[in-house]
């Protein structure tokens, strides 16, 4: 129901403003796909008021109007880390003169041990005929084309007697994203108390599979495309968010994503305290899952960083293994094109001077 977005609030045309008291983070793929299987080995963040997520998203969903909204979610709502929320979002977002026409189908699922106490393998399978969510290889939800249920309008939550979300997801390609932030709706995520900060989401590895009906691995319909173990940061594969949006109490900051000891780390901190100084949790079971896999497309050792608009900065350290690596995106060639956020709400309802929204990534 409460959507992530891909926007930056600007104080002056092409200059980013970080006006909120907290910093979150988002990591997303440069590539998008039409169908596939997506897995990530993660220990999620938790704490009342937080959202720790993995999701698929069509990059232009926020435009609204006649641009379809296409999204599939796994979200840990910090008030209850023993459950996760699955969701499909389709329909059309609001735009000038048009209402919010998005449709959601949220469901809750148990996780044991709790998502912030242990690593789990989270997965999403997206095909023309179904969408499935998995935890540690077990299917916990499968939504089949023509059999969708529990659909509601996002604006007002009115029940829909019919929805064709699986078919509608096929209108656009999606990229894979991870983010950590805090929503202002306490009823959804829990009451906020910043004494919990900092909190972290740890990503051991990510696997992306192509949809290849009848030609996949081990007789499946999915063929492994690449595995990233985050021993280094692949700027040709990943970019970092640098934006905020209505209802979010944090600024999404590129300064709050790190790699350390073969782990990607997404942080939620107080503003000005963007850092990771703790110990990386161990995940021997997850390490074993990829220890025998080919390194052909594993991490960035074979990547070409100059092909990406992101730059990779490493703290000076006598030990590459122990170095924490903050990764920053360059804000280049920004184009200001509107005054609404990804949810379609105006970010500047009082028409203050020099307040615009950047729709570039």
Predicted regions and their residues:
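GH16 jelly-roll
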Residues: 18-292, 340-344, 357-361
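Generic short N-terminal amphipathic or hydrophobic helices
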Residues: 11-14, 87-88, 323-326
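Fungal extracellular Ser/Thr-rich, low-complexity intrinsically disordered regions
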Residues: 281-297, 301-306, 311-361
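Generic secretory/membrane-interface signal
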Residues: 2-3, 11, 34, 39, ...
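Fungal secretory targeting signals
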Residues: 1-19
């Amino acid at each position: 129901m409460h959507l992530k977005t891909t926007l930056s609030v600007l104080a002056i045309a092409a200059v980013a403003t970080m006006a909120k008291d907290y910093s979150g983070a988002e990591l997303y793929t440069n590539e998008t796909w039409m169908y596939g299987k997506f897995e990530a080995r993660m220990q999620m963040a938790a704490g009342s008021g937080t959202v720790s997520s993995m999701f698929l998203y069509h990059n232009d969903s926020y435009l609204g109007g006649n641009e379809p909204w296409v999204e599939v979610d796994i979200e840990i709502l910090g008030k209850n880390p023993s459950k996760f929320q699955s969701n499909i979002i389709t329909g059309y977002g609001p735009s000038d003169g048009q209402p919010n026409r998005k449709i959601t189908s949220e469901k809750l699922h148990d996780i044991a041990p709790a998502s912030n106490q242990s690593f789990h393998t989270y997965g999403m399978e997206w095909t023309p005929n179904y969408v499935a969510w998995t935890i540690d290889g077990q299917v916990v939800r499968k939504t089949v084309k023509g059999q969708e249920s529990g659909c509601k309008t996002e604006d007002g939550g009115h029940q829909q007697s019919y929805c064709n979300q699986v078919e509608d997801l096929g209108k656009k390609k999606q990229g894979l994203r991870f983010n950590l932030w805090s929503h202002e709706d306490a009823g959804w995520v829990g009451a906020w108390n910043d004494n919990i900060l900092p909190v972290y989401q740890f990503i051991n590895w990510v696997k992306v599979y192509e949809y290849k009906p009848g030609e996949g691995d081990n007789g499946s319909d999915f063929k492994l495309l690449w595995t990233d173990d985050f021993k280094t940061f692949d700027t040709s594969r990943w970019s970092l968010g640098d934006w905020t949006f209505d209802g979010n109490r944090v600024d999404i900051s590129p300064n709050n994503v790190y790699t350390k000891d073969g782990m990607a780390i997404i942080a939620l901190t107080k503003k000005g305290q963007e850092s990771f100084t703790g110990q990386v949790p161990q995940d021997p079971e997850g390490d074993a899952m990829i220890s025998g896999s080919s390194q052909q497309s594993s991490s960035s050792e074979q990547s070409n960083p100059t092909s990406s608009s992101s730059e990779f900065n490493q703290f000076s350290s006598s030990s590459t293994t122990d170095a924490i690596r903050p990764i920053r995106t360059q804000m280049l060639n920004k184009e200001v094109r509107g005054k609404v956020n990804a949810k379609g709400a105006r970010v500047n309802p009082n028409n203050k001077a020099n307040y615009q929204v950047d729709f570039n990534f």
